[in-house]
Amino acid sequence: MASPQHPGGPGWTGPRNQCITRTRQEVLPPGPDLPCPGPEEAQDGPTSNSNMTTRELQEHWQKEKSRWKHVRLLFEIASARIEERKVSKFVMYQVVVIQTGSFDSDKAVVERRYSDFERLQRALLKRFGPELEDVTFPRKRLTGNLSAETICERRLELREYLRLLYAVRAVRRSREFADFLTRPELCEAFGCLRAGQYARALDLLGRVVPLQEKLTAHCPSAPVPALCAMLVCLRDLERPAEAFAVGERALRRLGARESHRYYAPLLDAMVRLAYALGKDLASLQGRLDESQLRRPTHRGATLKELTVREYLS
């Protein structure tokens, strides 16, 4: 039986009541550039005063090179189909995204209309105009858009368009590019979460999160809201062990970023899950206590309260 002194007990007033609230500036979502450190910004190498031998230095930099190995993605327009609505017909293109360099078991597949590509192009031109001078966007046709010949040609043109975009560093790291490939699915998933459709939300998140992780490899914390949404779904579906495993993934991505709006609520949820699973919660509780000592505030939002606010528009 849970006691008032333990997480889950009826009288427990631990981490949740002390969860961190954020100032308006802190809770704003990250900017469109997802400005997180990449290999060129890494500062954790050996100093000039290091006593490491030449061999040790070589081994260290080999590990660093492996750690920051650039994720390369390939884009393929695998197929196309004609979607019929009451008053219109249009083509849906199946975009397949594959990570190179190793076997990719999480091949991502999404569907987008030509108009979706058009919106992406307009948004990118607005931000990166001069950098896109070598990128050709497939022109719009007034007639024949549903012919087999046009669809085949456009599949090849859109594949080349994505390849050229991805070759531009600023574009592939932009929020616009990541949103183009993930936002519709994330919006649907979070909508299902708000509606209490946890199984459907979990299915959608399970397919889109691996793609989001690949697209935002330069910014490890970017997928944290989606990972936390998966935790909430699994927890409410009474699958605590899986929820805890997903929470560990989210914590690894946050690292020591105590100022992140998800840091304390996630730790609070993990403490409760650890207690329910009979796991050692001392380390998690210690991290949460230290965070609250350094940033003493009143009660903040729970993890579920945070996740249901994401992707509202």
From Swiss-Prot:
The residues listed in the UniProt record as binding a 1,2-diacyl-sn-glycero-3-phospho-(1D-myo-inositol-3-phosphate), with positions renumbered to this chain, are 113, 115, 140, 154
Gene Ontology terms: biological process: protein transport
What domain notes does the record hold? The PX domain binds phosphatidylinositol 3-phosphate which is necessary for localization to the endosomes.
Residue span of region Disordered? 1-61
Protein name, entry field? Sorting nexin-20
Cross-referenced SUPFAM superfamilies, in alphabetical order?
PX domain
Q: Does Zinc count among this protein's keywords? A: no
Keyword Nucleus annotated: yes
Just give the chief location class.
membrane
According to the record's subunit comment, the protein's assembly and interactions are: Interacts with SELPLG. Interaction with SELPLG is controversial.
Which Pfam families does this one have?
PX (PF00787)
Q: Where is the PX domain?
A: 71-188
Q: What keywords are assigned to this protein?
A: Cell membrane, Cytoplasm, Endosome, Lipid-binding, Membrane, Nucleus, Phosphoprotein, Protein transport, Transport
The protein's topology relative to the membrane is: Peripheral membrane protein
Compositionally biased tracts (Polar residues): 45-55
Its function, per the record, reads: May play a role in cellular vesicle trafficking. Has been proposed to function as a sorting protein that targets SELPLG into endosomes, but has no effect on SELPLG internalization from the cell surface, or on SELPLG-mediated cell-cell adhesion.
The terms under GO molecular function for this entry are: phosphatidylinositol phosphate binding; phosphatidylinositol-3-phosphate binding; phosphatidylinositol-4,5-bisphosphate binding
- Tell me what gene encodes this: Snx20
Per the record, the similarity remark reads: Belongs to the sorting nexin family.
Kindly list the GO CC terms recorded for this protein: early endosome membrane; nucleoplasm; plasma membrane
